[in-house]
A protein has these predicted regions:
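Short, small-residue-rich loop/turn micro-motifs
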Residues: 2, 76-81, 148-153, 202, ...
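Short beta-alpha junctions and helix-cap segments that line functional grooves
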Residues: 59-60, 132, 221
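Conserved, mostly hydrophobic/aromatic
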Residues: 47, 75, 116, 136, ...
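Conserved SAM/AdoMet-binding glycine-rich loop
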Residues: 1-126, 137
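C-terminal, non-catalytic macromolecule-binding modules
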Residues: 107, 131-170
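Structural beta-strand/beta-sheet cores of well-ordered domains, especially the beta-sheet scaffolds
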Residues: 43-48, 71-73, 111, 142-145, ...
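Terminal RNA-binding accessory module
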Residues: 159-262
Length: 262
């Protein structure tokens, strides 16, 4: 599901795979976000799976102006090498992606950007992987996951030349995830000593605005905090992808590893 495509299928003039979110052409994601933001109550609106090709300045401005829209966006980029983006038919190119991330961060202060990449896609070269790793180092995504390409029967990619071995795909996965773990530790360390607004999901476990359920890290909080409520907590420590907001000497009952760390 591509959330940035919301409403485009109702436009009088049919959109193309690169049409930007534009409410002047009809109902769009920005229309929905503003309507949801106007609803009374205390809640977060979290945007998942936004296709980079459909992002627009209007969408960036709308998110910035709607306080109930979480300062978090999920934007699967899949790769950064033009060679691979073309083979994957991603409707974007390297320079467009680089410029888009800069625009998003400049237009939405405090935004946490989550993305996913695929390694081991047919035809991927060492140069492609090096370019991807350099992009990850430079951009320092707040949240990032990596998938190994899987040759699924019946897909176009399954018939492509240049299929890679499982051993090579595994090696490239380890290479990129090792790099991201270092970056994730840096990102988590920035929160220590700061007060963070969290939503308590279960006794002793909460989630910050920059963490989506199931895929991102957790914030471990005192078990006395009421479940289902927002709370402001002081971050006292960090562990991999997770944050600690516990009194001195208190430890979580157990750590659960985020999927992006697996």
């Amino acid at each position: 599901q591509d959330t940035t495509y919301f409403g485009m299928d109702t436009w009088e003039q049919r959109p193309n795979p690169r049409s930007p979110v534009d409410s002047s052409r009809g109902t769009a994601l920005t229309t929905l976000l503003r309507q949801l933001n106007a609803i009374e109550g205390d809640f977060w609106i979290r945007l998942l799976y936004t296709h980079p090709a459909h992002w627009s300045d209007e969408l960036i401005k709308t998110i910035a102006e709607c306080p109930k829209v979480a300062r978090y966006i999920d934007i699967p980029l899949q790769h950064i090498s033009d060679h691979m983006l073309t083979r994957m038919q991603r409707e974007t190119n390297s320079q467009y992606i680089r410029d888009l991330i800069v625009r998003i961060r400049a237009g939405i202060p405090g935004i946490a950007v989550r993305t996913t990449f695929i390694v081991g896609f047919p035809g991927e070269t060492e140069a492609d992987v090096e370019e991807l790793c350099e992009f990850i180092r430079e951009t320092k995504f707040e949240r990032l996951g990596v998938f190994r390409y899987s040759q699924e029967e019946g897909t176009k990619a399954a018939k492509m030349e240049g299929q890679l071995t499982t051993k090579l795909k595994d090696a490239r996965y380890r290479q990129t995830m090792s790099l991201q773990r270092e970056i994730a530790a840096e990102v988590s360390a920035r929160y220590v000593g700061k007060t963070l607004r969290v939503l308590v999901e279960e006794p002793g476990v909460a989630r910050g605005e920059a963490d989506a359920p199931d895929i991102d890290g957790r914030v471990y909080v005192p078990r006395s905090l009421p479940v289902g409520e927002f709370a402001d907590v002081l971050i006292t420590g960090a562990r991999d992808y997770d944050l600690l907001a516990l009194p001195k000497g208190e430890k979580p009952k157990e750590y659960k590893v985020a999927k992006q760390a697996q």
